Every structure is written in structure tokens, then in C-alpha cells.
């Protein structure tokens, strides 16, 4: 968990994959505001590469780029909103949303946080570092992530969310630079985004199993909301 929370289990993973395309389409539309050409728009390039890695249909990807760049004549406006607070049992949470209607999203978040606590802006942000997060896998077995991190300019690294992957951590401004440098160090980039890493993560083993289940259920409910892009949680592991 440690940084970005992800659904577990086959059914949840399949459902999460379906949601992933919708979330990536939003990210693409927002990034495309800066131009429809990934070659000259690094933010768009990163999310397009991620979309291709997860096999987003080409027509869906291209439609999102055109829509975001204003080439279809459709008005597209998504607002980036962060919600901060605590899951049950005082586990800090940061929820990143892209919404076309904050007046809809805000009350939905208040309802979802009833089993925890919705805080004011900055209430838990102090306990997270804003970082670049690059998940990558070795091209060949035995590639050294420490050497790759040093040579590519990453600040740190740790095991990734998926088995066999590495999560490279960067300064926010170095995200694109490091993601471009990693392939030369023997790592294929799976995803690259800005996110929040907890400074003082709670060990899940320190929670009663029933309490941990309550935390997981809370996070799953938050993640299921259509306006939620990412959920960052202060749990280790």
C-alpha cells in the first residue's frame, strides 16, 4: 500500500482495469490541454505511454487526445481537487479527484468519509511527500535497480506494486527526465505519475485484522467513486 492504494483480488482487479481506462482517458484529456502532440507535451507523453502499456484501445486514446486538445468542438473541463482525512482507525488518506462538477463530488466525498474523518486542506498533507512515482520492470532478470536509480537520477527506489517491478521515486520536476533515462538502464517504464508517499506509514500488522478490513473496505468505497483518480494511504507495505 505505502503510497497508492490498489484493489486486490481477481474480481476487484478486473473491475479496476475497467475503471483504469476511464481514469486514463481523463488524464489524457487534461494533459492534452497543453497540446495534442506527445513529442512536445511531456505530460501527455507519459500518460499516453501508460495507456499503451495497459492496452487502451487506440480509438479511445486518440479520441481523448482530440477532445482534450479542443479538436472535436466539445467543451471539456475537469477540475483537480484533493480531499484529505483519515480512514477508520486514524489511517491518513489523500484522495485525488478529477471532476466536471465539484458540487457533486464534494458531498459524495463527505458521505464516503463518514466512516472515517474528512479533514481540511493541509490536515494530513504534511505527513506525505509529493513525489514522482515511476513503476518499471527489468528488461532482463538481474538488472540492478539501485544502479538504475543512481544513473537515471531517481532519489530512491522500492519494490513496486506488481511482482517483479520497482517503484522509482523522483522529485516532481524530474519525473519526465528519469522516466526517459530508465530504459537505457535496463528498465521498461510501466507508469509514471505524480503522487504522495507517506512519511510515517503505519504497519498494517499493528492493526487488528478486523480493523484492517474496515480500512480496506473504506478505501475500496472511496476508490469506486467515478471522480476519484488516485487514493494515497499512510500504510506500509
UniProtKB/Swiss-Prot annotation:
It comes from the Bacteria. Pfam families: TACO1_YebC_N, Transcrip_reg. The keyword Transcription regulation applies. One of its GO terms (biological process) is regulation of DNA-templated transcription. InterPro entries: Integrase-like_N, TACO1_YebC-like_2nd/3rd_dom, TACO1_YebC_N, Transcrip_reg_TACO1-like, Transcrip_reg_TACO1-like_dom3, YebC-like. Keywords: Cytoplasm, DNA-binding, Transcription, Transcription regulation. It is found in: Cytoplasm. Gene3D superfamilies: 1.10.10.200, 3.30.70.980. GO terms for cellular component: cytoplasm. Its main location: cytoplasm. One of its GO terms (molecular function) is DNA binding. Belongs to the TACO1 family. This is Probable transcriptional regulatory protein Bpro_2928. The lineage of its organism: Bacteria, Pseudomonadati, Pseudomonadota, Betaproteobacteria, Burkholderiales.
